A protein has these predicted regions:
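C-terminal engagement/docking regions of AAA+ P-loop ATPases
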Residues: 304-329
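Conserved catalytic/switch belt of AAA+ P-loop NTPases
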Residues: 173-212
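AAA+/P-loop NTPase substrate/partner-engagement loops
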Residues: 123-153, 160, 250
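Walker A/P-loop
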Residues: 98-133, 162, 231
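AAA+/SF3 P-loop NTPase mechanochemical coupling elements
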Residues: 165-168, 203-222
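Conserved C-terminal "switch" segment of AAA+ ATPases
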Residues: 56, 165, 226-232, 243-309
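Pre-Walker A (pre-P-loop) alpha-helix and adjacent loop at the N terminus of AAA/AAA+ ATPase modules
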Residues: 61-106
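Interdomain "pre-motor" coupling segment immediately N-terminal to P-loop NTPase/helicase cores
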Residues: 12-65
């Protein structure tokens, strides 16, 4: 089928070709050198690599995809979507692989940064890896820890490529500005080479000590404050300031979520096709991340009241926080 510059009228099936991400002979040599009955975790990793083999899908859209729904669903991400669309256009009718410059999404919590990354993976037809930097204290989470250490394991990048099906997954580094780690180890140190196309092609995880090709990974980092991010990282990414959606956009997001939740559940048919303007106005006061929980609460309250219409009184109170669990002083 021709892949000329033809307007796309619907979703396109991604084009996939195979890409080798590691050298089988190198893995075999490493496995053969392991002492008997030692380094069982490392032995299992090498065996898993040999069993699955080095070939992974490298995917890209088979043409310029229709992105109207994404523009509608993510109104505060238009500049990012514009750049993604341009980079897809460059490779859509060529033999070139898809290249997307690493993205850094800056903005307050709850504006949809992580949701955008999931939608990007869906748009491109690839997988997604996720690292929540704020919840981690181990500095080796991205690049792995030496197999000499007790409890060591491969890093998230290695796992996404070796255990996954794709050579070019979307890799999300969430809340990169909150990266912790031991004082003697920079948890973001491995990103300096991973975010550079040339050096990422020969990335060596410290646990497996086998080079893997991470050059095709599509990087999406999220953060609230750029001041906490090292300058070498900022120099390697395209930075986007993501604002909270305005009132009109927030109402559209709320309406789309209502329709999506209603359509995803059999019980949804018992509710009105669209919510009232007053309910949407109330929902628009919430951050996008909070809207789904609020709709589920509202649907449940309406059902308990034996109604098929969601009313303002069904919505949770604005600013209501979950009570902490544990002792109080």
């Amino acid at each position: 089928m021709s892949q000329g510059a033809i307007a796309c009228v619907g979703p396109r099936i991604p084009i996939a070709r195979m890409r080798s991400i590691f050298n089988m002979a190198e893995v075999e040599r490493k496995l053969a050198k392991l002492p008997e009955r030692e380094h069982e975790a490392l032995r299992g990793t090498y065996q898993r690599m040999l069993d699955k083999g080095p070939q992974r899908f490298q995917v890209k859209p088979s043409g310029l995809p229709v992105m109207d729904e994404l523009y509608e669903e993510l109104p505060n991400f238009h500049p990012v979507l514009d750049d993604v669309r341009r980079q897809i256009a460059l490779c859509e009718d060529s033999g070139d692989a898809l290249e997307i410059t690493p993205l850094l999404l800056l903005g307050p919590p709850g504006v949809g940064k992580t949701h955008f990354a999931r939608q990007l993976a869906t748009l491109l037809g690839t997988g997604m890896g996720f690292v929540a930097m704020s919840s981690l204290t181990a500095g080796w989470v991205l690049s792995g820890a030496s197999s000499q250490w007790k409890g060591a394991r491969p890093g998230k990048v290695f796992e996404a490529l070796v255990d996954g099906d794709y050579a070019n997954p979307v890799m999300v580094v969430d809340e990169i500005d909150k990266a912790g780690g031991e004082a003697c180890y920079d948890p973001l140190g491995s990103l300096y080479s991973l975010l550079e196309h040339d050096t990422a092609g020969n990335f060596t995880d410290e646990f497996a000590e086998v080079a893997v090709d991470a050059s095709q990974v599509i990087w999406v980092a999220t953060a609230n404050d750029a001041r906490a991010i090292p300058e070498p990282i900022l120099n390697r990414v395209n930075v986007y300031e993501i604002e909270a959606p305005d009132a009109a956009a927030a109402r559209r997001i709320a309406a789309r979520l209502y329709a999506a939740i209603r359509g995803q559940h059999d019980w949804g048919r018992r509710f009105d096709e669209t919510p009232s303007a007053a309910v949407l106005e109330r929902m628009a006061e919430l951050a996008p991340r909070e809207m789904r929980r609020a709709w589920m609460t509202a649907f449940g309250n309406a059902k308990l009241a034996h109604r098929g219409t969601v009313l303002c009184e069904d919505l949770p109170e604005p600013g209501l926080k979950r009570n902490p669990i544990g002792f109080t002083h």
